[in-house]
């Protein structure tokens, strides 16, 4: 039953973060992971990951050669070695979902305690290296004066090592579409993010392929997603931001951050903060007031 629940979670988080996702589950003094790779079904990447980590791949029942949900592929390592293996996985652009035992045996309760990703993992550092994550919100509007397309973006960047963050919103006319993509490219190249979130109001293969062609996404960890509808609601926006910026006097959080006239970068910024918070609730406690780029 435990392994079936694990496999369901592996499927869920692969759908959310992409194929380079690994769920690690604590089982006693080990962290284990499981998978299925047969003609009917493929769950996880246990064969690739064991080679990456240089550990042994086995099956739940070694006497049965075929693997399945009931005889899954499996591997693991001691809990005390977690930090070393996390580094290897992150260096290879994996997102790691950590499930730990939060109550004592014999029937421990397990919970997701952390989600590690290349842009949100903060380790003890002696030499400063930027740990930037960037969120890009792309939007097309129809200009009421010309009835032509207007191309708008909201870009936000957080360096989770220092808490510094930068916001940028700009719009371009239908005749300036190349400049639109060039400006996005310039921002991304400047901050060189470890992770990039690209947001669409409605995502499809066409707009995803277009942005891939227009800006250089080679060797970058990219998450394509649709905007969460709750981030369009003014009340939710202020309530969410208040948790991060509680001291804003008589102003609303949006006014305090000077975002009342920048709705597109506001969506980008909220998504980025939410992504960071989801991975590690402590990570955004040192976020500073954003600067405009």
Name what the model sees in each region.
Residues 1-293:
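Basic, polar low-complexity surface loops/patches
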């Amino acid at each position: 039953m435990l392994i079936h629940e694990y496999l369901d979670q592996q499927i869920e988080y692969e759908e959310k973060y992409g194929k380079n996702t690994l769920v690690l589950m604590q089982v006693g003094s080990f962290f284990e992971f499981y998978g299925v790779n047969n003609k009917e079904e493929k769950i996880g990447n246990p064969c690739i990951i064991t080679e990456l980590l240089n550990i042994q791949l086995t099956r739940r029942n070694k006497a049965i050669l075929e693997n399945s949900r009931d005889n899954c592929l499996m591997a693991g390592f001691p809990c005390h070695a977690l930090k070393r293996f996390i580094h290897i996985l992150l260096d290879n652009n994996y997102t790691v979902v950590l499930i730990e035992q939060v109550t004592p045996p014999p029937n421990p309760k397990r919970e997701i305690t952390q989600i590690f990703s290349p842009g949100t993992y903060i380790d003890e550092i002696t030499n400063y290296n930027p740990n930037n994550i960037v969120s890009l919100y792309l939007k097309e509007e129809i200009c009421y004066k010309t009835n032509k397309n207007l191309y708008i973006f909201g870009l936000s960047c957080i360096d989770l090592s220092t808490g510094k963050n930068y916001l940028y919103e700009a719009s371009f006319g239908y005749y300036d579409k190349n400049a639109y993509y060039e400006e996005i490219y310039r921002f991304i190249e400047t901050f060189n993010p470890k992770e990039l979130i690209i947001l669409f109001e409605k995502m499809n293969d066409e707009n995803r392929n277009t942005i891939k062609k227009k800006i250089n996404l080679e060797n970058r960890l990219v998450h394509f997603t649709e905007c969460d509808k709750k981030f369009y609601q003014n009340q939710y926006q202020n309530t969410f931001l208040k948790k991060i910026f509680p001291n804003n006097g008589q102003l609303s959080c949006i006014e305090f951050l000077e975002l009342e006239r920048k709705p597109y970068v506001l969506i980008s910024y909220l998504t980025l903060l939410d992504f960071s918070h989801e991975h590690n609730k402590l990570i955004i406690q040192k976020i500073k007031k954003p600067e405009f780029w």
